[in-house]
Amino acid sequence: MNLLPSNPHGNGLLYAGFNQDHGCFACGMENGFRVYNTDPLKEKEKHEFLEGGVGHVEMLFRCNYLALVGGGKKPKYPPNKVMIWDDLKKKTVIEIEFSTEVKAVKLRRDRIVVVLDSMIKVFTFTHNPHQLHVFETCYNPKGLCVLCPNSNNSLLAFPATHSGHVQIVDLANTEKPPVDIPAHEGVLCCITLNLQGTRIATASEKGTLIRIFDTSAGQLIQELRRGSQTANIYCINFNQDASLICVSSDHGTVHIFAAEDPKRNKQSSLASASFLPKYFSSKWSFSKFQVPSGSPCVCAFGTEPNAVIAICADGSYYKFLFNPKGECSRDVYAQFLEMTDEKI
């Protein structure tokens, strides 16, 4: 969740995002960066710079390397540079410079992937990174890009040059033709892979439908309806076994859908009527909860299979529990920016 150019809450938070397995989340601040354990909530690292904001923090599971990009009113690093921070040495150890602003960075143990506004560059994750690939995209100001973290799957997915399409390439075999998925008619707003890299979920700027595709052939597996009104989708995430997804938007609601068993999702009693528009056959979330503040948030599943965590731009942390009937209750609330590493 990128909160640049300005966070209306005035708390210094510029960025919040989960690591690959959602076990941690990192925050970029106007004066440094922080790392938290997701569930249970605990501050793990806090680095404050005398002067300098961090607009993007990308973790690599729980290892000591993080990718940082400068941001905010006084960026710590130039926004056209990717800095790899070694948390054991407490300093940057790799620096990659570009001619334009960096929109996002993705990491896996052997690759650094840098997203610019109309291209994606792939480098070796070595002390002197070597550029391996360049992929063109459509205009991509949000820096949409997902990299499968699985050691047996090297898929990279990003917006294709054709608006609304997703391109999936296998970094282990770039000779293989990419998979092109005509996911939406409108501009893409959000894309995410499951941990295994077998499924991709997408949403467009309209934000009413979430589509799930098979990554090997690009076949549509499910179409899920978030709502009937346009919404800005902030985040989509699968759970560990890709049986569920959670979705957050600017309506202040987090929706939970069944990704594998469509019968769990709600459907209109008029769904079987063939003369009615497709809308009536839509599959709706089986559970949802309102983030009390209505603040922008990112969401992910917690350590328990029936828990969803929301990390909000106003510094609030929520843990909600849902049951098979779809009933939801708030389990934990905290202000994570006000924590210290002693407090849980």
From Swiss-Prot:
Asked if the Swiss-Prot or TrEMBL record annotates the protein with the keyword Transferase, the reply is no
Q: Does the keyword Oxidoreductase apply?
A: no
Matching entries from Pfam families are given as: PROPPIN
Keywords noted in UniProt: Autophagy, Lipid-binding, Lysosome, Repeat, WD repeat
Question: According to the record, where are the WD repeats?
Answer: 183-223, 228-267
**Primary location:** other
List the GO biological process terms.
autophagosome assembly; autophagy of mitochondrion; cellular response to starvation; glycophagy; nucleophagy; pexophagy; protein localization to phagophore assembly site
UniProt-recorded Gene Ontology molecular function terms: phosphatidylinositol-3,5-bisphosphate binding; phosphatidylinositol-3-phosphate binding; protein-macromolecule adaptor activity
Q: Where is this motif: L/FRRG motif?
A: 224-227
Cellular compartments annotated: Preautophagosomal structure; Lysosome
List the record's Gene Ontology CC terms alphabetically. Answer: cytosol; lysosome; phagophore assembly site; phagophore assembly site membrane
Task: Summarize the protein's role.
Answer: Component of the autophagy machinery that controls the major intracellular degradation process by which cytoplasmic materials are packaged into autophagosomes and delivered to lysosomes for degradation. Binds phosphatidylinositol 3-phosphate (PtdIns3P), and other phosphoinositides including PtdIns(3,5)P2, forming on membranes of the endoplasmic reticulum upon activation of the upstream ULK1 and PI3 kinases and is recruited at phagophore assembly sites where it regulates the elongation of nascent phagophores downstream of WIPI2.
State the similarity comment.
Belongs to the WD repeat PROPPIN family.
Q: Domain text from the record? A: The L/FRRG motif is required for recruitment to PtdIns3P.
Entry protein name: WD repeat domain phosphoinositide-interacting protein 3
| Gene that encodes it | wdr45b
